[in-house]
Regions:
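A short, conserved, highly charged catalytic patch centered on acidic carboxylates
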Residues: 1-117, 127-304
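Carbohydrate-associated surface elements
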Residues: 123
Length: 304
């Protein structure tokens, strides 16, 4: 089934310009890795929707398996009210296909853990199992103890903690960014991916979550709103053609709010250029972000 992590996002913190993941239970930061993002997205679901207190969640518990010379560790264990293991979770990176081997691995771990439920997830698909004796029974629906109980409140702070919105964004920009983040990233049935980019300034904040729009066959547009290490907020849009990123633009929402003329940089095989996004694409902070995607596509095609 579609992962419950799809509409959840990990918290981030900037340390000396580096964007790091923040584990809210351990109150520590970690390197921004795909598997760790999946783990923290699931934690966000468990604590915010499923109603499981952070005090009943553990990480990296050592499991000593027969014939296993390495020290295997669990990704997540959730406990019941009596602090008995309730759920064992194995996390994979989003590009890892979950197969029988992964299920067998987590089942081996569970021989030592003894949880009645097991979950294997890559953040896109969840595979739930119920353990009855020696049987591992696949579940068609999410087990009852983990059915969402709480409504998520996605306030401005929610998006700031997850590095979608920077703390220096002007008030008019905050209203746009909060509404746009909800539109882009709150629906679990819409494709969202974390994209990484090398070789560009940290100011651009390119490495973040993008809502993916299919324009036509083999043509996609990725749209992101992301905070940078300096408290700024960027609107980043990427054109992907035939599986390759061919152009992107990045704009400061504060420059848009201040009605600065040269507010946007476009990068493509043709090089770098500066434009006024308002004039070129009819964009302003009163627009619905989804309504201007066709104009973003036209603009990037023109410059690629």
């Amino acid at each position: 089934m579609l992962s419950k992590a799809l509409s959840h996002f990990p918290q981030f913190r900037f340390r000396d310009g580096e964007k790091r993941l923040r584990n809210t239970i351990l109150k520590k930061t970690f390197v921004n890795l795909p598997e760790e993002r999946v783990r923290l997205k699931l934690i966000d679901f468990f604590t915010k929707e499923a109603g499981i207190p952070g005090s009943r969640i553990s990480f990296e518990s050592q499991v000593n398996l027969a014939g296993d010379k390495s020290k295997s560790r669990t990704d997540i264990i959730c406990y019941d009210k009596d602090f008995k293991p309730l759920l064992l979770v194995e996390c994979k990176a989003p590009d890892i296909k979950i197969d029988e081997k992964a299920a067998i691995q987590v089942a081996r771990y569970n021989q030592k853990v003894g949880a009645p439920f097991v979950l294997v997830s890559n953040g896109i698909l969840d595979f739930w199992f119920k353990i009855e004796g020696e049987q591992i029974i696949p579940q068609e629906e999410i087990p009852k103890p983990f059915i969402p109980k709480n409504e998520i409140i996605r306030s401005l702070t929610y998006w700031e903690e997850r590095a979608f919105i920077g703390h220096h964004l002007k008030p008019v920009g905050r209203a746009f960014a909060k509404t746009s983040c909800a539109s882009l990233f709150s629906d679990p049935h819409q494709p969202v991916r974390f994209l990484s980019f090398d070789g560009f300034p940290e100011e651009f904040a390119l490495g973040h979550y993008y809502r993916i729009y299919g324009i036509k066959e083999n043509v996609k547009i990725g749209v992101s709103i992301a905070a940078n290490p300096y408290g700024g907020t960027r609107l980043n849009v990427v054109l992907n053609q035939g599986g390759a990123n061919t152009a992107f633009f990045t704009t400061s929402l504060n420059l848009i709010a201040e009605q600065e003329n040269m507010n946007t940089e476009i990068h493509s095989s043709k090089g770098r250029s500066e434009i006024d996004l308002t004039n070129e694409a009819g964009f302003d902070l009163n627009k619905n972000i989804g309504d201007v995607v066709p104009e973003f596509h036209r603009l990037l095609l023109k410059h690629s």
